[in-house]
């Protein structure tokens, strides 16, 4: 069993403490991984991930990543290589370096020179990420999170100036960059990545979370793990499940247990799905969401995957990566202020074969995700000091940079209009009150997801499981229960959490962060392992509960008497508390 060492509160000014902590972490993982040999395929995947890890050291890409989905939206081609004329006259590094101003901005990407001057105002991630790197080789910023063929979509042929002659001098090459970390921090994490325990030793979803917390860059960890403000809702999403208890039946023949069910017209192996999460390449630089697709479809148990609008990979890449044509993939949609872009995107993913649209409605403005904001957007070696001379919002963090294009004027009327434009089932994602579930049923959408964005939006929103317990009896009273399917996500870490939601009437249960962490550490094999863990926990708990099918899960199997008693202490979840890292206070600058 992994020992969750309290390693995170290390004095930054004490080199000896850092060395001791590093040694402790390494010894912990060495001991943990010593009992079971790694499989050949795992070792190969591990080497690939380790080799690629340095490609992730990018701070400025987080401001550029709002363009990831935006630029991938129109990627109708599977061929991801940009169309370049290599016969054009070569351009010297000295010439590139002259064009280093906002009104005269050239950059180098993968050995080719581009004039981005006219593109600057239209860059969804803001001008500054390009402007501060004008006259430089920006490959390390561009490549990890952009499909190469986005260049063809947004850069006119005449702005593709020609191949670079030789290479840019080191001082004009944007370095891999990890805000808030020293070279020693990065080296230690790379070493830890090479010492990950074999998957056979991973026995619960918290193991993935712990390993990710120790190996991800600070910026990636902050983006993945952060919640809004004081993170009360982030914690409450999970803690609410601990205020629900079971009332198991006995003397039931449970030799055969069937956990398959139906969701949105498709038969599925399990009652849970991988919820949409942005920027998987922050944790898995080589494959990103493509490995999630593979992990969801390569094993015995197939799991629906919800593809994010803000994915690091294009919809084409993710769908093509699915091991089987029968694999179920849904699409999570942020509605763009430019509705034509949204309309084109919907047509595209429908043509690609997704089975449903999940329209996110809880993000008219991005929440105050302070852990993310602490690692301020920085584009140059000079960092924030240089940026203070501009009007860039230094403290926006990755989340704020990502939110630029989302339409804050979205209304119920827009949902009804969207229904007319697609044959796909439409599910409203981010519903947080019973009255809105009733409204959704009345306008005829196919489903809702009770969700507060993983506690990343309005702090002190209620836990989705609590909203579910309140909502389902009212839907039944109004004869609306069969009008739409109700899903729930947020805070789920155990098979018992899934069963509690199903007992209360949920059609399916979504998990996001656990699969992010599994993918970050082990790629597709980690995703498959996380699925196996959750599946086994559900099957075991159903036997202990005295039921053999999803249809037998009813509210009478639960004790809800303390669900709303938020002032009553919940059972101490030791593993959750060990891996949870809350917001921090601002520190003094180094002298």
Swiss-Prot record:
What does the Swiss-Prot or TrEMBL cofactor note state? Binds 1 heme b (iron(II)-protoporphyrin IX) group non-covalently per subunit.
Q: Which GO terms describe its cellular component?
A: cytosol; mitochondrial inner membrane; mitochondrial intermembrane space; mitochondrion; nucleus
Q: Which SMART domains match?
A: Cyt-b5
What results from changing residue 453 to Q? 12000-fold decrease in catalytic activity and 50000-fold decrease in catalytic efficiency, with ferricyanide as electron acceptor
Where in or outside the cell is it found?
Mitochondrion intermembrane space
GO MF: heme binding; L-lactate dehydrogenase (cytochrome) activity; metal ion binding
Active site positions: 453 (proton acceptor)
Cofactor(s) this protein requires = FMN; heme b
Q: Per the record's keyword annotation, is Acetylation included, yes or no?
A: no
Catalysed reactions listed for this entry: (S)-lactate + 2 Fe(III)-[cytochrome c] = 2 Fe(II)-[cytochrome c] + pyruvate + 2 H(+)
Q: What is its main location?
A: mitochondrion
Tell me the null mutant phenotype. Inactivation of this gene leads to a deficiency in L-lactate dehydrogenase activity and consequently to the inability to use L-lactate as a sole source of carbon.
Q: Which PROSITE patterns match?
A: CYTOCHROME_B5_1 (PS00191), CYTOCHROME_B5_2 (PS50255), FMN_HYDROXY_ACID_DH_1 (PS00557), FMN_HYDROXY_ACID_DH_2 (PS51349)
Residues forming the Cytochrome b5 heme-binding domain are 88-165
The UniProt record gives the binding positions of pyruvate as: 223, 334, 453, 456
Q: Supply the alphabetized keyword list.
A: Electron transport, Flavoprotein, FMN, Heme, Iron, Metal-binding, Mitochondrion, Oxidoreductase, Respiratory chain, Transit peptide, Transport
Instruction: State the conditions that upregulate or repress this gene.
Output: By L-lactate. Induced during respiratory adaptation.
Q: What function does this protein fulfil? A: Catalyzes the oxidation of (S)-lactate (L-lactate) to pyruvate with subsequent transfer of electrons to cytochrome c. Is involved in the utilization of (S)-lactate as a sole source of carbon for growth. Can also use ferricyanide as an electron acceptor in vitro.
Q: What additional remark is attached to this entry?
A: Present with 4590 molecules/cell in log phase SD medium.
Q: Read off the domain note.
A: Consists of two discrete domains, an N-terminal cytochrome b domain from residues 81 to 179 and a C-terminal flavin-binding domain from residues 180 to 566. In addition there is an extended C-terminal tail. The cytochrome b domain is required for efficient cytochrome c reduction.
What family does this belong to?
A: In the N-terminal section; belongs to the cytochrome b5 family.
Q: Give the protein's recorded name.
A: L-lactate dehydrogenase (cytochrome)
Q: What is the lineage of its organism?
A: Eukaryota, Fungi, Dikarya, Ascomycota, Saccharomycotina
Q: Which gene encodes it?
A: CYB2
């Amino acid at each position: 069993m992994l020992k969750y060492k309290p390693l995170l509160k290390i004095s930054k000014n004490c080199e000896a403490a850092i060395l001791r902590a590093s040694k402790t972490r390494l010894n912990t993982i060495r001991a943990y991984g010593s009992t079971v040999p790694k499989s050949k395929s795992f070792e190969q995947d591990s080497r690939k991930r380790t080799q690629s890890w340095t490609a992730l050291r990018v701070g400025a890409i987080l401001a550029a990543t709002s363009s990831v989905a935006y630029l991938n939206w129109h990627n109708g081609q599977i061929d991801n290589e940009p169309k370049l004329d290599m016969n054009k006259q070569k351009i010297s590094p000295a010439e590139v370096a002259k064009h280093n101003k906002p009104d005269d901005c050239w950059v180098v990407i993968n050995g080719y020179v581009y004039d981005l001057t006219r593109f600057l105002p239209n860059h969804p991630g803001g001008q500054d990420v390009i402007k501060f790197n004008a006259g430089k080789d920006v490959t390390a910023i561009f490549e990890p999170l952009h499909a190469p063929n986005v260049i063809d979509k947004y850069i006119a042929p005449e702005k593709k100036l020609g191949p670079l002659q030789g290479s840019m001098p080191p001082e004009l090459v944007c370095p891999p960059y990890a805000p808030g970390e020293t070279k020693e921090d990065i080296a230690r994490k790379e070493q830890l990545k090479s010492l990950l325990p074999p998957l056979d030793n991973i026995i619960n979803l918290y193991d993935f979370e712990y390993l990710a917390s120790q190996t991800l860059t600070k910026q990636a960890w902050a983006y993945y793990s952060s919640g809004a403000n004081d993170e009360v809702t982030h914690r409450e999403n999970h803690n609410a499940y601990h205020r629900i208890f079971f009332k198991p039946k006995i003397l039931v023949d449970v030799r055969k247990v069937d956990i398959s069910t139906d969701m949105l017209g498709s038969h599925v192996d399990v009652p849970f799905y991988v919820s949409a999460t942005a920027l998987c390449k922050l944790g898995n630089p080589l494959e990103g969401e493509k490995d999630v697709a593979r992990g969801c479809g390569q094993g015995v148990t197939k799991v629906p995957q919800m593809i994010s609008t803000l994915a690091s990979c294009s919809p084409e890449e993710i769908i093509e990566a699915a091991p089987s044509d029968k694999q179920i993939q849904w699409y999570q949609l942020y509605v763009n202020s430019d509705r034509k872009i949204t309309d084109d995107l919907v047509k595209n993913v429908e043509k690609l074969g997704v089975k449903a649209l999940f329209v996110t409605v809880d993000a008219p403005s991005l929440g105050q995700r302070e852990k993310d904001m602490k690692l301020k957007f920085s584009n140059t070696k000079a960092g924030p000091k240089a940026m203070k001379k501009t009007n860039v919002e230094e403290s926006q963090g990755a989340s704020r940079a990502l939110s630029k294009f989302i339409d804050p004027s979205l209304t119920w009327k827009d949902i009804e209009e969207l229904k007319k434009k697609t044959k796909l089932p439409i599910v409203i994602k981010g519903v947080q009150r019973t009255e809105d579930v009733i409204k959704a049923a009345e306008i005829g959408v196919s489903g809702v997801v009770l969700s507060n964005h993983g506690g990343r939006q309005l702090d002190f929103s209620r836990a989705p499981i609590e909203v579910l317990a309140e909502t389902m009896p009212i839907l039944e009273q109004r004869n609306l229960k069969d009008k739409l399917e109700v899903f729930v996500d947020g805070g789920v870490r155990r098979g018992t959490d899934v069963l509690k939601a199903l007992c209360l009437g949920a059609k399916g249960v979504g998990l996001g962060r656990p699969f992010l962490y599994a993918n970050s550490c082990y790629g597709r094999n980690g995703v498959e392992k996380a699925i196996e863990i959750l599946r086994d926990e559900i099957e075991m708990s159903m036997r202990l509960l005295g039921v053999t099918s999803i249809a037998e899960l009813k509210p009478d199997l639960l004790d809800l008497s303390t669900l709303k008693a938020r002032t009553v202490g919940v059972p101490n979840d030791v593993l959750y508390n060990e891996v949870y890292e809350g917001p921090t206070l601002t520190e003094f600058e180094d002298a």
